[in-house]
Amino acid sequence: MVTIRLARGGAKKRPFYNIVVADSRNARDGRFIERVGFFNPVARGQEEALRLDLDRVEHWVANGAATTDRVAKLIKDARKAAA
């Protein structure tokens, strides 16, 4: 099953997540099909906290990709910010 989920990066105590489309059987930070954005939960000031390619997300969801709960919330936030 193809899922849209977070892949953790960054340093210890400084998380940074790539939002990726991946096969659910692959490891969390392992092989992925496409990177559709990023999420920086510790962004400060003018730093960009969330960037998401909504066209690609909609493409993958239309083709049967499932989203994790956290990514679904991030997509909702990105749509609200874009409107």
UniProtKB/Swiss-Prot annotation:
InterPro entries according to UniProt: Ribosomal_bS16 (IPR000307), Ribosomal_bS16_CS (IPR020592), Ribosomal_bS16_dom_sf (IPR023803)
TM helices/strands, residue ranges: none
NCBIfam families: S16
GO-annotated biological processes: translation
Pfam families, alphabetized: Ribosomal_S16
Protein source organism: Shewanella pealeana (strain ATCC 700345 / ANG-SQ1)
Keyword terms, alphabetized: Ribonucleoprotein, Ribosomal protein
Name of the protein: Small ribosomal subunit protein bS16
Keyword Nucleus: no
Family: Belongs to the bacterial ribosomal protein bS16 family.
Listed GO CC annotations: cytoplasm; small ribosomal subunit
GO molecular function: structural constituent of ribosome
